[in-house]
Curated annotation (Swiss-Prot):
Family affiliation: Belongs to the UPF0173 family.
An example Gene Ontology molecular-function term: hydrolase activity
InterPro entries noted in UniProt: Metallo-B-lactamas, RibonucZ/Hydroxyglut_hydro, UPF0173, UPF0173_UPF0282_UlaG_hydrolase
Protein name: UPF0173 metal-dependent hydrolase Hlac_1347
Signal peptide as annotated in the record: none
Record keywords, A-Z: Hydrolase
Gene3D superfamilies: Ribonuclease Z/Hydroxyacylglutathione hydrolase-like
Transmembrane segments: none
Lineage start: Archaea, Methanobacteriati, Methanobacteriota, Stenosarchaea group, Halobacteria
SUPFAM superfamilies recorded: Metallo-hydrolase/oxidoreductase
Pfam families recorded: Lactamase_B_2 (PF12706)
UniProt xrefs under PANTHER family: UPF0173 METAL-DEPENDENT HYDROLASE MJ1163, UPF0173 METAL-DEPENDENT HYDROLASE MJ1163-RELATED
Amino acid sequence: MELTWHGHSTWHVVVDDTELLIDPYFDNPKTDVDPEELDPDYLLLTHGHSDHIGDVDRYEGATVVATPELTGYIQENFGHENAVGGMGMNIGGTVECGDAWVTMVRADHSNGIDTGYGTSAGMPAGFVIGDKKPTQESDPDCTTFYHAGDTGLMSEMVDVIAPYLEPDAAALPTGDHFTMGPAGAGIAADWVGADVVFPMHYDTFQPIEIDTREFVNEVKAAGAAAEPVVLEGDETYVLENEFGSDGD
């Protein structure tokens, strides 16, 4: 599984022959990529704020993976014809997306659409992406990535996401102000039980500027087993599980 961070909360995930793009927003200082170079099969949207759906119009051909409310808005306003299940999905559901399985999980945040915040986009969400369908039986050959969306600390991280979905890697919002900051992200790194954790949703604009060394220190202070990794913009991390498989 290949994970590329394009700044803010935008991630390009490759699982075998399937490409997924999460929260496309390329108007951020961490990326130099030309958005037109990406051709995702699936467009995963955690919520409707403009810094998470800012570039959805570039990917009309992708299948939308979002709540029914946000899916309907995207289809009506940007012309996307395809959506998982024809109408989107909701918290707790798992859908097959090509070679990947995507589970929608809860996030604690607000969720108006665009900058007016006048239209409901349903519940905010996070996603757990795996190369196998999650079951109650632990599968050491499964590789999983947790994108937390915009959120603060929540008990679901330790009660549901860690024991059931068992993420190998997690991307955690770290910029504070609108989400949890480095201290909260450090605790989250411990709670989700991942092997590696990445900071995201920081340094895009003034209220969320941080020193990423704080994130690294807070992960260690929390006693998390995870390795904190601070990616450069547009950098790719190849995720392998503990048995050396990257899901191929």
